[in-house]
């Protein structure tokens, strides 16, 4: 009887010390990202609301939604970025073969979206010169004069989008797009 009891105790201890289920260890614990902040953008005397949401449970189905609303609540910019596109257009040296790494990568993009260096005050400096990455030279010159602020965000490894408010056209436009 003692031998049987000893065998049961040792077996129990042995099983308790086994590592957990590998699939369970690789499971991704992810919460949707929902952040917002206010900054002057369309008007130097008012605060617009910048909002980002990262929704979805699997990287291929995730969507990063970014919008800007004027102080009065009117939406002036809205873009949806697919998680699969963000993953596909990244540094080829970055190993994103595992779903867990893809989720971490997308969450990092969302968490860093409102980094201070993405807010450009002003969007264009008076001494700046338009180059081949400026899609709208008229807007670029308008921004030099208005001194309105800009915002940049990344679409991929070498694809940054710079946006600003055009007082003349009363809408947000891309004023620079490059590396």
Identify the residue ranges that each predicted region occupies.
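Short, solvent-exposed mixed-charge patches
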Residues: 178-179
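Short, exposed beta-strand-loop hairpins at the edges of beta-sheets
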Residues: 151-170
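Surface-exposed acidic loop/strand-edge motifs in secreted or periplasmic proteins
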Residues: 36-141
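Acidic, negatively charged sequence signal
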Residues: 27-28
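Short beta-strand segments that buttress and anchor functional surface loops
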Residues: 53-55, 149-154
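C-terminal motif of bacterial Sec signal peptides marking the signal peptidase cleavage site
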Residues: 13-16
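Bacterial signal peptide processing site
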Residues: 18-21
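Sec-dependent signal peptide recognition
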Residues: 2-8
